[in-house]
Amino acid sequence: MMRAAYFASKLNFKIESTCRASMITQVERIKIVSWERIRDEYIKILKTDKPSIGLVILQKTGLMKYVFPEIDVMYDMEQSPEWHHKDVFAHTLQVVDNAAKLTDKMEIRFAALVHDIAKPNTRRIHPKKGYTFHGHDAVGEKMLDKVGKRMRLSKNLTKYLKKLTLLHLRPIALVKSEVTDSAVRRLMVSAGNELKDLMVLCRADITTKNPRLVKRYLKNFDIVEQKMQVVLDK
């Protein structure tokens, strides 16, 4: 069943209705498949040019509930419209597809998939701000230990995903002119060898359809990278 989702994503085709119906009725049979196999099929989907095709199939057929429940609960989870124009699941799909356009590196694409994994657990309603997700970066980092063990991810991959999830909100905070060199340096030290990958993830996280806003956000990340270079040159 996951292989069908992979081929649909790889070859950009729709699954025939009878086959899709069978996937839905037989969905619980995924329980007999090893987590190593599930992991491998998931990674194959992430390596395609447009992973969202396969990920949507997993969700629509009910497979996602079994193979990645933390992603499944993002579906239809509303975000405040003044901040996000999509629900959490749709936003995540777009980030993954954006990452696929920016890099062939599977690890970054995987990070794009899980970077907001804790939003369902941290969603609160503020009387003026609407929905908030305070701390979803730190909570998400902790959740990935359980995900890594269940999906039989390598320790290195789990560590990598945890780091990018924890840090994905940090770069944009460095745009302000009053930010000190020491603040920039702290992020660089925290990110370490994954700094470039973190910046790719941040750029992929721009999902607005407004070209003016896209240009502004990309420019902000250019400013952050310029500040990093200044610190390196000192």
Segments (PLM) and residue ranges:
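Short flexible/disordered coil segments
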Residues: 78-90, 130-134, 174-179, 217-234
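Histidine/acidic-rich helix-loop-helix segments that form or flank divalent-metal centers
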Residues: 82-84, 153-218
